[in-house]
Amino acid sequence: MISGTVKPNFWSRLLLSIIAIFALPNAQSFENQNNTENYSSSVSIQQALETVKVAREVQRQAIPQPSISRQTEKQLKIQPHFFTEALNISAPIRAGPLLI
């Protein structure tokens, strides 16, 4: 093997992969211990969420929501927001100075 043709990150990748192989069994045993703790904490979180949902429903039922009954009247005549007298029919289409 010629060392000049080998990519410079080969040795660092090899070293990291060897470390990962030896560290994997330790990490898996640590993860199994945490799974039992995570299960009990997830159950308590679910119970807390259910309690919050029930409390919100009770609050919604206790406070009556005011009903908004607004009747809008339809306008008989549609009026534009601008006046046609203000528009110049012979004005240039492009933006620029008024006098060329």
UniProtKB/Swiss-Prot annotation:
A UniProt-annotated Pfam family: SecM_small
Domain of life: Bacteria
Protein name: Uncharacterized protein HI_0908
Organism: Haemophilus influenzae (strain ATCC 51907 / DSM 11121 / KW20 / Rd)
